[in-house]
Amino acid sequence: MRSSAASDVYKRQGIYYESNETTVPLVSNTQMNNMKIVGEKLACMATSQVYIFTDTKTFDQINNLSIKDISTYQTDKYWIAEGSKGLRSIQRKGANQFEAINEAIILDGPYSNSSYDIVSKNDKIYIIPGGKSLTGDNSFNKAGSVMIYDYEKWSVLEPSVVQNKLNTWPKDYTSIVVTKNDTEKEIIYVSSFGYGLFQFIDREPSAVYNKTNSPLENAHGNEGFYCRVDGLAFDKEGNLWMTNSEVSKAIKILDKEGKWHSLSVESLNGKYTINDILVTSNNDKWINISRPTSQACLTVVTNSNSLDEATSYEFKNFIDTDNNDFSPNNYTCMAEDKNGYIWIGTNKGAIYLTNPKLATTENNQSMRCTRVKLINEEGIPYYFLDNTIITTIKVDNGNRKWIGTDGSGVYVLSEDNQEIVHQFNTSNSPLLSDKIYSIEINENTGEVFIGSDKGLVSYKGEATKGKDDYSDVYAYPNPVRPEYRDKVTITGLMDNSIVKITDLNGNLVYQTKSLGGQAIWNCRNTKGVRVASGVYLVLSATEDSKESVVTKIAVIK
């Protein structure tokens, strides 16, 4: 095709072919989303039509179908993918006439690939798509849905239902929390970057809070969709805190009685992209601004018995353990580990504060921080994830840090911060993308959910929540058969238990420390040799309890 003809074709919408240096239209003024060969025919998919060409003169047109993909399995019989409407088979009955052969097959799965924020509650996983860019420069313009997984099936609170009930189209969800009211009804709150705060009671849209019915404000007095809310978090008393960007009072609180409160925080008022609220174990509230401008900072808010008055402390700069200045351009996420240390994600890597109470002092402008330093294969020390954009940090029950990045996948740091336990990316794992949005952990099972821009995966983690006693300890698989050569999981332990495995004569075979309430044994002794067939005793104790046999494991070699 000549360049002039090619240029002409590319300016048009439709289907064209060239004959004798002449461009001939087959379908005009219709945008085509996909084209593919099916059998010996050409299928062209528009927004609500499909054209199936036998040749340049003969084609069938199927109307009122939004087909994402098509494949043939017999002459004039096709499988069609209709997105959320499922998978169907159709057959040709005549010119432009098709009929469905089967009911739509709808696969059980998430409503959206985007897993912007995830929360685990009551052995259910709640996911929202979203939201806004890491720097807050723009929103993703995604319809708001809440996807819920109960380990058997998926359900979804669709945006159309919210539109019908609340007369507001939900979009750009940013954070989600789940609780129960006094009558044990499930309550879901979802914040939005422009549309306020949404409330669902027992999976039904109940309310949308914005400037018309609450103290929530629109950015800089703008009308329309500028009620920018984020950072949902419950404090120790059950009050719901949230950030409200670009307004006169940046912190809003919906107390457990349903009354609203507004807090004026000088370092946050009027600022762009106020992100998360981390409620620490001592009920302080850590708040980050992620936009890479002079506004980027961390703020700690403390309040005693009042939700209408608080003291705040702002800081931006750090001095690391090598006495170097550490001043990132933006603060992206926060977490508290089991030692009470505060971890902070930035555009230059992750740091942690071993004495976070110093942040609530007047002299906090150059806080001391620790940057994780590891040793490479050549014996040379290096800063862990130096100059890497950190998107999320989650701490498991073994005090290991799951760190998500913007393009490098997930890293798991050991309890003592001296070793990379796991490194997951699209090259070595089922991760669907290396651009990680969110990480959440089911504390009861240890399962880790990793959300990205392209979908959700889960990993059977080794750390679970510790039990109060040893009354329900068990191991699986048990017995361990010859074909099973991976790991044996011992679960139901108390936190940080010392676990010993012995033979029936009391000889020590293996010893480890539990990760929260769970320990792993690879059926090998201390020399790395797989143990002989037999029954092995599992003994466990904490620093405050007496050692006892908690379960047995049968190994068949």
Where are the regions that the model predicts?
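Conserved beta-propeller blade signature
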Residues: 7-8, 42-44, 77-80, 125-128, ...
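Residue-level detector of Asp-centered blade-edge/turn motifs that repeat once per structural unit
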Residues: 37-39, 72-75, 120-123, 178-184, ...
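Signature of short aromatic-glycine-proline-rich micro-motifs recurring in repeat-based ectodomains
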Residues: 110-118, 168-178, 220-233, 271-276, ...
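Short, conserved, GDST-rich strand-edge loop motifs in beta-rich repeat architectures
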Residues: 127-144, 195-198, 249, 290-299, ...
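Glycine-centered coil/turn sites that cap beta-strands in beta-rich domains
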Residues: 468-500, 518-521
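Glycine-centered tight-turn motifs at strand-turn-strand junctions
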Residues: 509-531, 542-546
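C-terminal tail/sorting-segment detector
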Residues: 537-557
